[in-house]
Amino acid sequence: VIALDPATLNEETLLKGIPEQSFTWSPNEDFLIYYPREEGEKEQGALRRIVSPADRIPNTRGRSFLAKYNIANGVSERLTYGNHSTYLQDISPDGKFMIYSTSKENITQRPFSLSSLYLVDLETLKVDTLFHDERFLGGASYSPDGKQLLLTASPEAFGGIGKNCGNHPIANDFDTQAFIIDLATRKIQPITKDFNPTVSPLQWNRGDGCIYFNTDDGDCKNIYRYSPKNNSFEKLNLETDVTSAFTLSEYNPGIAAYIGQSDHNAGVAYLYD
């Protein structure tokens, strides 16, 4: 792992001999989570057994798991095993906990898969099941204080608490909704139920405590800021109609950089103050 100083272009080697997979840094930069993969059983002979509809796709029998690499001593520790792949969702701000998910097929009922979400104590490896075989579940990320999770899911998730489609029996599953769950009480709040655009979370900012979303807003992709304190959304006044990338300082949300296009330019980078 090499660090590059953009101002001076000086390079510094931080780590050597780490596992040759992609990885995620812990918030304190004292360990990495990486993703070892195991290949599935190979079929021999002229006939091939189709285990499930997804088994028709090449390489779907392979499984990916999670492992922890300790930077101080170079020791790797396997964290997950099993018949289903496991996916890292987030690491708590203090680096003590990890959220991961699994998914399995469910060919008899929409959306034809079931997802589970787990919280792991990285010191004791104790596992707390947050959701088991939940339909329509998406991703999860920690709040800055580690006491809540920001969830994304279909309006149909969690018993349909995010549905806002009148008398229509089926909500639009492509209309991604955002929810906040309190880890102490397990109460879930559908924060985008009355917000029209489809959302994709960018960051729950430490500086102002607000959540920033990229949205599909009609013909545009706009950036909105949500205040959990006031339960309100605010559209950022940007120079672009379609914002393809947006990033802001973790502790100073007054400074951001973004890339996008409008009716008179394309692929332009801006600073937002």
Positions of PLM-derived features:
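Residue-level detector of Asp-centered blade-edge/turn motifs that repeat once per structural unit
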Residues: 27-28, 93-94, 144-145, 206-207, ...
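Hydrophobic beta-strand positions that form the internal "hydrophobic ladder"
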Residues: 29-32, 98, 146-149, 210-211, ...
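Serine-hydrolase catalytic core recognition
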Residues: 208, 245-273
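A flexible loop/linker signature enriched in serine peptidases of the S9 family
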Residues: 1-2, 16-21, 35-65, 80-86, ...
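Conserved beta-strand position repeated across blades of beta-propeller domains
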Residues: 24, 90, 141, 203-205, ...
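Short loop/turn segments that connect beta-strands within beta-propeller blades
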Residues: 5-9, 70-74, 121-125, 182-186, ...
